[in-house]
């Protein structure tokens, strides 16, 4: 884990990466973001949190399925690495 809270939000539908989404996936992506918000509330991340979507090899993606990292419960740094 990269933070005390490190969650992954994945769609059931297989989408390889953010670069592979289509206009048909707009509702699905919105649902994923609403899920992030609800999880942030559930895990009491009221001081803030970071969301990350790594895309393809140079973007740091190592799992070939779209997912959002939700990181919280620590002060985030910039640049991330």
Map each language-model feature to its residues.
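HIT superfamily nucleotide-processing domains
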Residues: 1-81
């Amino acid at each position: 884990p990269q933070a005390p809270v490190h969650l992954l939000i994945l769609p059931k539908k297989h989408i390889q990466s953010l670069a592979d989404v289509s206009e048909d996936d707009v509702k699905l992506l919105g649902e994923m973001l609403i899920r992030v918000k609800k999880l942030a509330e559930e895990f009491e991340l009221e001081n803030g949190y970071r969301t990350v979507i790594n895309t393809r090899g140079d973007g740091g993606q190592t799992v070939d399925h779209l997912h959002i990292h939700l990181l919280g419960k620590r002060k985030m740094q910039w640049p991330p690495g």
